[in-house]
Amino acid sequence: MPPSRNRHSAQRVFTWDKIKMALAAAEEGFYIWNIKTGVIHYTDRCLTMMGASRKEKAPNIFTQPELTIHEEDQAFFSQEVRRYLDGHSHVPMRIEIRMKKLNSKSWSWVRVNGLARRDKQRRPVMLVGVWVNITRRKTAELRAAEDRDLFHTLIEHIPDSIYFKNRESRFVLAITATANELGVPAP
């Protein structure tokens, strides 16, 4: 089949409705920010992540981060957006932030992805991308870190000699008491 025929066929298959279905299946929201005018458009999924509705004017997270982004993440977010838009990266923008839901004041983790469209002078004129709710992943990572810390605290206070070796019989973990017994530096 000639390539031009495949291209036309794909254009009929990949309709906006199907793209929206795919974004919904991936639990991703889509945004378009016109940098020149400051106007931003969000899909319903972005608005849901933000705790906003179509009836209200949702803030632009890029120009008003203080309204939706966690205080501890605002400077990092603004710096990373600026660095990306200034052309210091050749890969798409990816920033993980905590976002406040406007309707409940609860927080969720969101990865903001973006790709800039640039004019002939390489100045950014538009940023297009998706938001991904990563709260489940971040929660799991935090729980795993807490479990790891608890595990290390528990084994450090057991008076017995405890260590772990890999298949090559190399030490991969030893508690301080065991390290002292073996005469090696404590981990």
Task: Report the location of each language-model feature.
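Per-ARNT-Sim (PAS) sensory domains and their PAS-associated C-terminal
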Residues: 72-76, 85-115, 121-125
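Hydrophobic pocket-lining residues within nucleotide cofactor-binding pockets
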Residues: 35, 117, 134
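PAS-associated C-terminal cap
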Residues: 1-21, 130-147
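PAS-family sensory domain signal
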Residues: 15-66, 109-111, 154, 161-186
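PAS/Per-ARNT-Sim sensory domains
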Residues: 56-83, 91-95, 142
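Short, ordered coil/turn segments that flank beta-strands lining enzyme active or ligand-binding pockets
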Residues: 35-36, 102-103, 120-121, 167
